[in-house]
Design a protein with these regions (language model features):
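Catalytic-site neighborhood detector that most strongly recognizes the C-terminal catalytic loop/helix
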Residues: 392-417
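Short, charged phosphate-coordinating catalytic segments
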Residues: 144-149, 218-252
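Short, basic (Lys/Arg/His-rich) helix/loop patches that form interaction surfaces
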Residues: 331-390
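N-terminal core-binding DNA-recognition domain of tyrosine recombinases/integrases
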Residues: 52-168
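Basic, Lys/Arg- and aromatic-enriched nucleic-acid-binding interface segment
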Residues: 196-226
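C-terminal secondary-structure termini that scaffold catalytic or DNA-interacting sites
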Residues: 419-435
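Flexible interdomain linker/hinge and immediately adjacent N-terminus
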Residues: 150-197
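Basic, alpha-helical nucleic-acid-contacting "clamp/cap" segments
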Residues: 250-319, 339
Length: 435
């Protein structure tokens, strides 16, 4: 097909895009499938390309997990395809993905690294490296499948390098044979710092003004769950199996485990509620078990006051009695911060509260701040890299390493908190908010 754009005829204006759909098995296990499609100028799908088959690491294996979905990679691939075939196909003199050469890829990677984002910034180094890795793997998979039909070869795409592992052992690895030049920017990343004293106010405030998500805040702040994972938590009575389990010894709860090992269908309308980044059974950090139990008991009382689909028994319910979606959870958290926490801090006589409240007018505080707060507490409790990775539910140690690198600053600026949260919940919550 001729990919040259005809801007006067939207039906002939084609663009590569990602299309995703969520399915579920008869036993309720939910999974996502993503495709690379061609859409016309009206946004309608005109063709499924099958190119997604060459994006994943399972392309050449005999077994692939049901939940394996290359969606994040497909956005990088579509960006490259649109640049090569849609935007510059005429200049390059190509009409098919097989015609892409290494010099064309080099141009694209440099263009991606230098491109200014809508917010005025530039792609981070890690994002550029991810783009190069994904696109290189995609082209290598095509070359492996179709051989000489593809102009670029695997030998052109990769170079062998010997690296030294942390164990001291030498290992040969195949590294993408590209180097992109980008604009380096000092960035503090998203605003996410939250002083311990602010958390002590946020918890009782959530119970009063946002009881439907207060326990979700606890799951993030005391068990390190991501917002999308929170929405996948089930009640103890779920027919899929208890979403939360307790280990009690001598009348005392010693361990609490949150089951986010699988995504299940939790709504009768099949609407997606959120995704689990790492499927696992996540424990509540021991120091926070007491406050977590208090929050859980309050949430169970709340659930008795609302209607929900008993067949699915979701832990979090929206105003329609359906499992709460990530987007709804995010909006409710934002409203809690903007409508209640921020005004309370700005009006405080405590200078630290007033300064932080002003910062909330200048920066958006998202749900990721809760997981960041949790991680800071782990660092202050002297957890090592393995401990951070375990309690955070990370796939790689990269994030843990970054926190440990900044440990000195964290110790100086923040403080450990645990028992004071219980006190804040019972005393501040009772006296200040009449809970």
């Amino acid at each position: 097909m001729d990919m040259e754009q005809n801007y006067l005829d939207p039906e002939r204006t084609m663009k590569y895009a990602v299309f995703s759909i969520r399915n579920s098995l008869e036993n309720g296990i939910s999974y996502r499938r993503s495709f690379i499609v061609l859409k016309n100028g009206y946004g309608m799908i005109v063709r499924f390309t099958r190119l997604e088959d060459y994006a994943g690491i399972y392309s050449w294996r005999t077994y692939k997990p049901l939940q394996a979905d290359p969606e994040p990679k497909l956005y990088f691939i579509c960006g490259m395809l649109n640049y090569m075939l849609v935007e510059n196909g005429k200049r390059f003199g190509i009409r098919h993905v097989f015609d892409i050469t290494k010099p064309m890829l080099e141009e694209y990677f440099n263009s991606y690294a230098m491109a200014e984002k809508p917010d005025g910034g530039y792609h981070k180094e890690s994002t550029v490296e991810k783009c190069i890795s994904v696109v290189t793997q995609f082209m290598a998979n095509l070359s492996r499948k179709f051989g000489g039909y593809v102009k670029v070869t695997r030998d052109e795409l990769y170079v062998e390098k010997t690296i030294r592992l942390h164990t001291g052992k030498l290992e040969i690895r195949h590294i993408p044979n590209f180097q992109a030049t980008g604009v380096f920017e000092e960035s503090d990343g998203p605003f996410r710092d939250m002083p311990a004293k602010v958390m002590e106010i946020l918890i009782p405030m959530a119970i009063k003004y946002a009881p439907d998500i207060a326990f979700g805040i606890a799951l993030q702040a005391f068990a390190g769950l991501r917002a999308g994972e929170v929405c996948n938590v089930r009640q103890e009575c779920s027919h899929y199996g208890a979403g939360i389990r307790f280990v009690e010894i001598g009348g005392t709860v010693r361990r609490i485990e949150i089951d986010v090992s699988r995504e299940y269908k939790l709504r009768s309308d099949d609407t997606e509620i959120g995704s689990i980044k790492k499927h696992r059974k996540q424990g509540v950090y021991p120091d926070f078990i007491k406050i977590f139990l208090e929050m859980y008991e309050r949430h169970k009382k709340y659930l008795k006051t609302v209607d929900y689909e008993e067949e699915f028994a979701p832990m979090f319910v929206n105003s329609n009695g359906l499992a709460m979606s990530y987007e709804t959870y995010r909006r409710k958290f934002k409203a809690l911060i903007n409508d209640h926490l921020r005004p309370r801090l700005v009006e405080s006589t405590d200078p630290e509260f007033r300064i932080y409240g002003q910062m909330l007018y200048e920066n958006d505080l998202g749900t990721h701040a809760l997981r960041h707060w949790f991680t800071v507490q782990l660092v202050l409790r002297k957890e090592d890299m393995a401990g951070l990775k375990f309690w955070r539910g990370d796939k790689s140690p990269e994030s843990a390493f970054q926190y440990l690198q900044n440990k000195g600053d964290l110790v100086r600026e923040l403080e450990i908190t645990a028992d004071r949260l219980v006190t804040a919940l019972l005393e501040i919550g009772g006296e200040m908010y009449g809970l």
